[in-house]
UniProtKB/Swiss-Prot annotation:
Presence of the UniProt keyword Heme in the record: no
Protein purpose: Catalyzes the ATP-dependent amidation of deamido-NAD to form NAD. Uses ammonia as a nitrogen source.
EC number: 6.3.1.5
Binding site for Mg(2+): 53, 164
UniProt xrefs under InterPro entries: NAD/GMP_synthase (IPR022310), NAD_synthase (IPR003694), NH(3)-dep_NAD(+)_synth (IPR022926), Rossmann-like_a/b/a_fold (IPR014729)
Gene (name only): nadE
Catalytic activity entry: deamido-NAD(+) + NH4(+) + ATP = AMP + diphosphate + NAD(+) + H(+)
Keyword Nucleotide-binding: yes
Domain of life: Bacteria
Classification via PANTHER family: NH 3 /GLUTAMINE-DEPENDENT NAD + SYNTHETASE, NH(3)-DEPENDENT NAD(+) SYNTHETASE
Oligomeric and partner information: Homodimer.
Protein name: NH(3)-dependent NAD(+) synthetase
A GO biological-process term: NAD biosynthetic process
Pfam families, per database record: NAD_synthase
Protein backbone atom coordinates (compact mmCIF):
# COMPACT_ATOMS: atom_id res chain seq x y z
CA UNK A 1 0.00 0.00 0.00
CA UNK A 2 1.36 3.43 -0.94
CA UNK A 3 1.72 6.17 1.65
CA UNK A 4 -1.16 8.15 0.15
CA UNK A 5 -3.39 5.08 0.04
CA UNK A 6 -2.69 4.51 3.73
CA UNK A 7 -3.72 8.11 4.48
CA UNK A 8 -6.88 7.80 2.39
CA UNK A 9 -7.92 4.46 3.89
CA UNK A 10 -7.60 5.90 7.40
CA UNK A 11 -9.58 8.98 6.42
CA UNK A 12 -12.39 7.15 4.64
CA UNK A 13 -12.97 4.66 7.50
CA UNK A 14 -13.87 1.71 5.26
CA UNK A 15 -13.57 -1.69 6.91
CA UNK A 16 -12.09 -4.59 4.96
CA UNK A 17 -15.30 -6.47 5.57
CA UNK A 18 -18.50 -5.77 7.44
CA UNK A 19 -21.13 -7.67 9.37
CA UNK A 20 -24.49 -6.53 8.01
CA UNK A 21 -26.33 -6.73 11.33
CA UNK A 22 -23.64 -4.83 13.22
CA UNK A 23 -23.26 -2.17 10.54
CA UNK A 24 -26.99 -1.52 10.28
CA UNK A 25 -27.26 -1.26 14.05
CA UNK A 26 -24.30 1.12 14.21
CA UNK A 27 -25.76 3.43 11.57
CA UNK A 28 -29.19 3.43 13.19
CA UNK A 29 -27.65 4.23 16.56
CA UNK A 30 -25.70 7.11 15.02
CA UNK A 31 -28.87 8.61 13.54
CA UNK A 32 -30.79 8.16 16.78
CA UNK A 33 -28.00 9.63 18.91
CA UNK A 34 -27.84 12.71 16.69
CA UNK A 35 -31.58 13.24 16.90
CA UNK A 36 -31.60 12.76 20.67
CA UNK A 37 -28.81 15.29 21.11
CA UNK A 38 -30.77 17.99 19.26
CA UNK A 39 -34.14 18.63 20.87
CA UNK A 40 -35.45 20.71 17.95
CA UNK A 41 -35.36 17.84 15.44
CA UNK A 42 -38.80 16.62 14.44
CA UNK A 43 -38.07 15.38 10.91
CA UNK A 44 -35.36 13.74 8.85
CA UNK A 45 -35.46 14.79 5.19
CA UNK A 46 -33.96 12.97 2.22
CA UNK A 47 -34.27 13.16 -1.54
CA UNK A 48 -34.98 9.76 -3.11
CA UNK A 49 -33.56 9.16 -6.60
CA UNK A 50 -34.22 5.45 -6.97
CA UNK A 51 -30.51 4.68 -6.76
CA UNK A 52 -28.58 2.57 -4.29
CA UNK A 53 -27.35 5.31 -2.00
CA UNK A 54 -30.59 7.18 -1.32
CA UNK A 55 -32.50 3.90 -1.04
CA UNK A 56 -30.11 2.62 1.64
CA UNK A 57 -29.94 5.91 3.52
CA UNK A 58 -33.71 6.27 3.40
CA UNK A 59 -34.38 2.76 4.67
CA UNK A 60 -31.93 3.11 7.55
CA UNK A 61 -33.38 6.51 8.44
CA UNK A 62 -36.94 5.16 8.52
CA UNK A 63 -35.85 2.21 10.66
CA UNK A 64 -34.13 4.59 13.07
CA UNK A 65 -37.18 6.85 13.20
CA UNK A 66 -39.43 3.87 13.90
CA UNK A 67 -37.27 2.98 16.89
CA UNK A 68 -37.25 6.59 18.09
CA UNK A 69 -41.05 6.64 17.99
CA UNK A 70 -41.18 3.45 20.03
CA UNK A 71 -38.94 5.18 22.57
CA UNK A 72 -41.35 8.11 22.80
CA UNK A 73 -39.67 10.62 20.48
CA UNK A 74 -42.01 12.58 18.21
CA UNK A 75 -40.33 12.56 14.81
CA UNK A 76 -40.83 11.35 11.25
CA UNK A 77 -38.93 10.62 8.06
CA UNK A 78 -39.75 12.67 4.97
CA UNK A 79 -38.86 11.32 1.54
CA UNK A 80 -38.71 13.81 -1.33
CA UNK A 81 -39.10 13.05 -5.02
CA UNK A 82 -37.16 15.68 -6.96
CA UNK A 83 -37.60 15.12 -10.69
CA UNK A 84 -36.34 17.50 -13.33
CA UNK A 85 -39.46 17.34 -15.48
CA UNK A 86 -40.17 13.70 -16.26
CA UNK A 87 -37.62 11.33 -14.71
CA UNK A 88 -36.62 8.41 -16.97
CA UNK A 89 -36.34 5.97 -14.09
CA UNK A 90 -39.36 7.24 -12.14
CA UNK A 91 -40.59 3.68 -11.65
CA UNK A 92 -37.43 2.90 -9.68
CA UNK A 93 -38.11 5.87 -7.42
CA UNK A 94 -41.52 4.38 -6.70
CA UNK A 95 -39.96 0.97 -6.04
CA UNK A 96 -37.51 2.56 -3.61
CA UNK A 97 -40.31 4.37 -1.80
CA UNK A 98 -42.33 1.17 -1.50
CA UNK A 99 -39.28 -0.51 0.05
CA UNK A 100 -38.52 2.37 2.41
CA UNK A 101 -42.16 2.99 3.38
CA UNK A 102 -41.55 6.60 4.49
CA UNK A 103 -43.81 8.42 6.94
CA UNK A 104 -44.33 11.28 4.48
CA UNK A 105 -43.52 11.82 0.81
CA UNK A 106 -43.36 15.09 -1.10
CA UNK A 107 -42.84 15.68 -4.81
CA UNK A 108 -41.14 18.86 -6.01
CA UNK A 109 -40.43 19.33 -9.71
CA UNK A 110 -37.16 21.28 -9.86
CA UNK A 111 -37.36 22.02 -13.60
CA UNK A 112 -39.05 25.45 -13.39
CA UNK A 113 -36.57 26.71 -10.78
CA UNK A 114 -33.50 25.34 -12.58
CA UNK A 115 -34.58 26.62 -15.98
CA UNK A 116 -35.33 30.06 -14.55
CA UNK A 117 -31.92 30.17 -12.89
CA UNK A 118 -30.20 29.22 -16.15
CA UNK A 119 -32.23 31.83 -18.03
CA UNK A 120 -31.50 34.58 -15.49
CA UNK A 121 -27.78 33.86 -15.69
CA UNK A 122 -27.97 33.86 -19.48
CA UNK A 123 -29.68 37.25 -19.46
CA UNK A 124 -26.81 38.52 -17.31
CA UNK A 125 -24.33 37.27 -19.90
CA UNK A 126 -23.36 34.04 -18.14
CA UNK A 127 -23.95 31.02 -20.36
CA UNK A 128 -23.85 27.78 -18.37
CA UNK A 129 -22.55 24.61 -19.96
CA UNK A 130 -24.67 21.47 -19.76
CA UNK A 131 -22.33 20.19 -17.03
CA UNK A 132 -22.77 23.40 -15.04
CA UNK A 133 -26.52 23.15 -15.47
CA UNK A 134 -26.24 19.69 -13.96
CA UNK A 135 -24.71 21.25 -10.87
CA UNK A 136 -27.62 23.70 -10.79
CA UNK A 137 -29.96 20.70 -10.61
CA UNK A 138 -28.03 19.16 -7.72
CA UNK A 139 -28.00 22.42 -5.78
CA UNK A 140 -31.69 23.06 -6.42
CA UNK A 141 -32.51 19.60 -5.10
CA UNK A 142 -30.57 20.24 -1.93
CA UNK A 143 -32.09 23.70 -1.57
CA UNK A 144 -35.55 22.13 -1.65
CA UNK A 145 -34.59 19.58 0.99
CA UNK A 146 -33.24 22.26 3.32
CA UNK A 147 -36.40 24.34 2.78
CA UNK A 148 -38.53 21.36 3.78
CA UNK A 149 -36.29 20.68 6.78
CA UNK A 150 -36.53 24.32 7.86
CA UNK A 151 -40.30 24.26 7.50
CA UNK A 152 -40.68 21.05 9.50
CA UNK A 153 -38.00 21.57 12.16
CA UNK A 154 -35.79 18.93 10.65
CA UNK A 155 -32.39 18.03 9.30
CA UNK A 156 -31.23 16.92 5.86
CA UNK A 157 -29.60 13.55 5.38
CA UNK A 158 -26.77 13.08 2.91
CA UNK A 159 -26.08 9.98 0.85
CA UNK A 160 -22.32 10.47 0.65
CA UNK A 161 -20.40 7.22 1.11
CA UNK A 162 -16.66 6.68 1.05
CA UNK A 163 -16.44 5.47 -2.57
CA UNK A 164 -18.06 8.76 -3.58
CA UNK A 165 -16.22 10.92 -1.07
CA UNK A 166 -12.78 9.76 -2.13
CA UNK A 167 -13.37 10.86 -5.72
CA UNK A 168 -15.33 14.01 -4.95
CA UNK A 169 -18.08 12.70 -7.21
CA UNK A 170 -20.76 15.08 -6.02
CA UNK A 171 -21.69 18.72 -6.43
CA UNK A 172 -20.18 21.08 -3.90
CA UNK A 173 -23.04 22.52 -1.83
CA UNK A 174 -25.38 20.35 -3.89
CA UNK A 175 -25.70 16.67 -3.07
CA UNK A 176 -22.52 17.15 -1.01
CA UNK A 177 -24.42 19.37 1.44
CA UNK A 178 -26.23 17.78 4.38
CA UNK A 179 -26.47 17.83 8.16
CA UNK A 180 -25.38 14.23 8.61
CA UNK A 181 -24.02 11.51 6.31
CA UNK A 182 -25.09 8.17 7.81
CA UNK A 183 -23.50 5.83 5.24
CA UNK A 184 -20.04 7.42 5.16
CA UNK A 185 -17.57 4.65 5.97
CA UNK A 186 -19.14 2.24 3.51
CA UNK A 187 -17.87 1.59 0.02
CA UNK A 188 -20.14 0.75 -2.91
CA UNK A 189 -20.13 -3.03 -2.52
CA UNK A 190 -20.83 -2.78 1.20
CA UNK A 191 -23.86 -0.61 0.49
CA UNK A 192 -25.12 -3.33 -1.85
CA UNK A 193 -24.50 -5.89 0.87
CA UNK A 194 -26.66 -3.99 3.35
CA UNK A 195 -29.49 -3.49 0.87
CA UNK A 196 -29.46 -7.18 0.01
CA UNK A 197 -29.64 -8.03 3.72
CA UNK A 198 -32.52 -5.59 4.22
CA UNK A 199 -34.46 -7.22 1.40
CA UNK A 200 -34.39 -4.40 -1.15
CA UNK A 201 -35.45 -5.20 -4.72
CA UNK A 202 -32.33 -6.36 -6.55
CA UNK A 203 -32.68 -3.94 -9.43
CA UNK A 204 -32.28 -0.99 -7.06
CA UNK A 205 -28.74 -1.96 -6.08
CA UNK A 206 -27.69 -3.83 -9.19
CA UNK A 207 -28.55 -0.98 -11.58
CA UNK A 208 -25.68 0.95 -13.18
CA UNK A 209 -24.89 3.91 -10.87
CA UNK A 210 -25.49 7.30 -12.50
CA UNK A 211 -25.78 10.88 -11.27
CA UNK A 212 -27.98 11.62 -14.33
CA UNK A 213 -27.44 15.39 -14.19
CA UNK A 214 -26.51 16.22 -17.78
CA UNK A 215 -29.18 16.73 -20.45
CA UNK A 216 -26.67 15.93 -23.21
CA UNK A 217 -25.57 12.70 -21.51
CA UNK A 218 -28.65 11.17 -19.86
CA UNK A 219 -27.99 8.22 -17.56
CA UNK A 220 -24.21 8.64 -17.94
CA UNK A 221 -22.64 5.86 -15.81
CA UNK A 222 -20.58 7.06 -12.84
CA UNK A 223 -17.72 4.76 -13.81
CA UNK A 224 -17.54 6.28 -17.29
CA UNK A 225 -17.51 9.80 -15.88
CA UNK A 226 -14.86 8.89 -13.29
CA UNK A 227 -12.66 6.83 -15.59
CA UNK A 228 -12.36 4.08 -13.00
CA UNK A 229 -14.58 1.23 -11.78
CA UNK A 230 -16.24 1.03 -8.38
CA UNK A 231 -14.64 -2.40 -8.06
CA UNK A 232 -11.20 -0.77 -8.11
CA UNK A 233 -12.32 2.09 -5.87
CA UNK A 234 -13.73 -0.37 -3.33
CA UNK A 235 -10.57 -2.47 -3.41
CA UNK A 236 -8.46 0.66 -2.92
CA UNK A 237 -10.54 1.69 0.09
CA UNK A 238 -10.11 -1.78 1.58
CA UNK A 239 -6.34 -1.39 1.35
CA UNK A 240 -5.87 -3.81 -1.53
CA UNK A 241 -3.47 -3.51 -4.43
CA UNK A 242 -5.12 -2.38 -7.67
CA UNK A 243 -3.80 -1.68 -11.19
CA UNK A 244 -1.46 1.31 -11.31
CA UNK A 245 -3.62 3.25 -13.78
CA UNK A 246 -6.68 2.86 -11.56
CA UNK A 247 -4.72 3.91 -8.47
CA UNK A 248 -3.40 7.01 -10.23
CA UNK A 249 -6.90 7.98 -11.38
CA UNK A 250 -8.37 7.57 -7.90
CA UNK A 251 -5.58 9.53 -6.25
CA UNK A 252 -5.86 12.35 -8.80
CA UNK A 253 -9.57 12.63 -8.02
CA UNK A 254 -8.82 12.57 -4.28
CA UNK A 255 -6.22 15.34 -4.43
CA UNK A 256 -8.04 17.52 -6.97
CA UNK A 257 -11.30 17.45 -5.02
CA UNK A 258 -9.87 17.93 -1.53
CA UNK A 259 -11.61 21.33 -1.34
CA UNK A 260 -14.99 19.58 -1.46
CA UNK A 261 -14.21 17.75 1.78
CA UNK A 262 -13.29 20.93 3.63
CA UNK A 263 -15.38 23.68 5.15
CA UNK A 264 -14.74 27.19 3.85
CA UNK A 265 -11.06 28.03 4.21
CA UNK A 266 -10.02 30.84 6.53
CA UNK A 267 -6.72 32.66 6.92
CA UNK A 268 -6.07 30.35 9.87
CA UNK A 269 -6.68 27.07 8.07
CA UNK A 270 -5.00 27.90 4.76
CA UNK A 271 -1.33 27.86 5.96
CA UNK A 272 -1.41 24.11 6.51
CA UNK A 273 -1.45 23.71 2.73
CA UNK A 274 1.75 25.72 2.38
CA UNK A 275 3.87 23.53 4.64
Amino acid sequence: MSRLQDVVVNEMKVKKQIDSVEEIQEIKQFIKAYVKSHSFIQTLVLGISGGQDSTLTGKLAQLAVNELKEEGRNCKFIAVKLPYGVQQDAHEVEDALEFINPDTTYTVNIKPAVDQSVQSLSEAGIKLTDFQKGNEKARERMKVQFSIASNTQGIVLGTDHSAENITGFYTKYGDGAADIAPIFGLNKRQGKQLLAYLGAPKHLYEKVPTADLEDDKPQLPDEEALGVSYHDIDDYLEGKEIPATARETIEKHYVRNAHKRELAYTRYSWPKYNK
